[in-house]
Amino acid sequence: LTPVAPDALAETYGGGGGAFGRHFDAILQARRRESDEFYAGVIPKSLDADATNVMRQALAGMLWSKQYFYYDVNRWLEERGCDPYLPSAKRAPRNEQWHHMYTSDVISMPDKWEYPWFAAWDLAFHVLPLTLVDVDFGKQQLDLMLSENYLHPNGQIPAYEWNFSDVNPPVHPWATIYTYRLEAALRGKGDTEWLERSFQKLLLNFTWWLNRKDRAGKNAFEGGFLGLDNIGVFDRSSPLPTGGYLEQADGTAWMALFSLNMLEMAIELSLQDRTHADMVLKFIQHFVSIASATVHAGGNTGMWDEEDGFFYDVLRLPDGQAQRLKVRSMVGLLPLCAVTVFEGGFQEKFPEIAKKFQGFLEARPELKTFIHDPTRMGHAGRRLGAILDEVKLRRVLEKMLDENEFLSPHGIRSLSRFHAEHPYVFNVGGQEYRVPYLPGESDTGMFGGNSNWRGPIWVPVNALIIRGLLQYYAYYGNEFTVECPTGSGRQMNLYQVAEEISGRIASLFLRGKDGRRPVNGGEQKLQEDPHWRDYVQFYEYFHGDHGAGLGASHQTGWTGFIARGLHLFATTTAEQVLELGKGAAFEEVNPQEAGSGTNPAPR
């Protein structure tokens, strides 16, 4: 507020006016005015007062969640008798493979109260709202995870402090290409040097995934934990009680998205330097192979279930048998998110790449039969990299948009409500494993017991679904419509579906017609007291039926995406998406003229 030390305030500004001197109020009001002016340039004017308040508090929470993080892992391990070069009878409690890691940085935390340590995949989501107010800080956060002090020499990105060797979803490439495009829109030119540097480091991470998580070399990936805590039948970070291993629908979908994001970067870099053109072909081939494995690998015991029209994890046993674990969860929706639309024209600029890719498909014609045909042109000559063809996309959307399954009043649930009456049960070795629908808090101690992916709404995966729907819309256009909600008789194009889901998420925080905010649940003080009711908390996750906030109560972190969601649909129209493709999300427009200008609550 002032550069003057507290004990010099009276002498500098004069006595009176309380402990801070008589000029304190004027200084405070000046800072308030400056803050108001800053946010007025960020928050779209088409948002109403309540939505404006929510967006501003979400952004403020993102900035408040910065924290200095110091951790000398080598020193910590040495104090516990762990030497990187000598075998030791005393095993370190954790992170004994991370002697190289040394952190002394300001990092965006998930929740400075409950989770005062970074998590790699959380951080990637943090960048989306953070870059609305500070692009440079967002880039710096992404740089940290790829720096020599963090990235393992083998290419692994550290997961989180409790176990750096655990595996988080590889969303770093997505955040990287997103940030590059946002900065290019804001400043008129993308930072290709930064993109090139990030691309080279992410190549190491991609190779680590290929070498460590594709056990059979068939592009069907494992991954383990992958950030979704208790979503599976078993603890995915531990050995299976059955023996064998899991082929994970989400792990394979994440790698398909990773390939697409790397392909986007390679194309962008090739436009500046043709020596990257071979990388374009490399990642096209990777994507097609991984996407085909998601749909086809294993034949009748692959991840795609033709009868159910859904994706499941596959348990592969030591004796060669395989079984789908038929849990309808976010795991089966994530393949929908592995999609990217590409503008036309690249083939003309790089005919040699187009020719080589065509030869690759002619040599492997079966690959194209299982997934969306990547050579088929859509709206405005665009092409689509997607696991799901139109038929499979409609089948998955039918379940996702069913209010008796995934679609809640406040977003997409992490587990289908179908399992409320039909819990999934798996018996092995005399022990029963159950996955019921739990819309609130967890009923087990798995991963500490303070999070739950068996029914609640989680904002980050909803963000990925919204992104995916907009990619499909830019390709299919207005002709592709689905019932939303399923069974309602109301047809929507995919832009409208994305906007509907975003509006339902926003309704968690906005006052409803009854004046109450679902996030505050039954807390009457928070709902009714004028001193509390307009101060919004951004929880870790939300009740799958009524939307009450659960888990860490100050996790603006990835829940801070709501700021980006509000901004996106207030500044981007369906017409712009059809005209500009994914570039529409970064188009700078007058907020008063942009978007529908409607309240972002459910329609």
Regions flagged by a language model, labelled:
Residues L1-R603:
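Acidic, mature catalytic/reactive cores of soluble proteins
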